[in-house]
Amino acid sequence: MSKIKETEIDYEEVERRIEVKELTNEIDTPDGIINFLEKRNGIHNFDFRNRYSVLDLVHCQRKSYYKQLGVKQEELLADVSGMWVTVRGDLLHEMTHAYKWREMDMEYKVTLDDGREATVAGRLDMYDWKTKTIIDLKTTKTVRWQIKHGILPRLEHILQVQCYYTMFSDVIPVENLNLVYADMQDIVTYRVKKNDLSGWIKTRIKDIEDSITRKSTPSGETSGLCQFCKYQSRCFDDGNGIEHKPLSAPKKKEDNENGS
């Protein structure tokens, strides 16, 4: 008759495991983590219709119109300076780590006249909780030169910060709005006047939605940013928009088939 080897039981370990089990309960992963991972992997589970970013509202309405229609974005004719703009922006945006409260997301609901609900998504660069200040960082080149020639500060940047004030002021206390322009040599900060843009936001969305209903392309709001737009060929062909040779082109057929 074979002998069964007895296994020594660690009763202290058993008791520890029981205690841990009683103190914890597995739940679903928080939505914030899931949303972060999905965004990093290009997964979006929301309907883009009736959904706008703050940038959609403060920049060209025609661009927002194309986006709402689902018009495919074109490929920019990239150059070295364009790549440097990206690198410069990445380097300077490291400054946002100066504040613990940074890259804060918010969704702001707007009820339209027909009862539909539109969503405006915004993200704060930085928030100083000590001084209750919203801080938005803009990276550019030749800051001092642009200020001297009246290019900076831009109206759309002012509207953007005021939109953040409108969206966030019911959630966090806001006493100051700061707009920061930075290049690799200079940093210049402006204090922006607080202004409730809830009515302006609703009107801006309504104008875009009305254009979609009428199937009438809004006029392009041309600016220096047009050279970075990914709808330039479409805008040029539709008229009342850019007049320069488009610096973007529809993606090649093989690229579309490969999903790139």
What annotation goes with each model-predicted range?
Residues 1-134, 141-148:
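Metal-dependent nuclease catalytic cores that hydrolyze phosphodiester bonds in DNA/RNA
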Residues 2-29, 151, 163-260:
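Metal-dependent nuclease catalytic regions and adjoining charged, substrate-binding loops involved
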Residues 119-121, 156, 221:
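A generic fold-level signal
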Residues 134-136, 204:
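Active-site-adjacent bridging/hinge elements
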Residues 138-142, 182-185:
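Short connector loops/turns at beta-strand edges and beta->alpha or beta->beta junctions
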Residues 153-160:
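Short, conserved glycine- and acidic-residue-centered signature motifs
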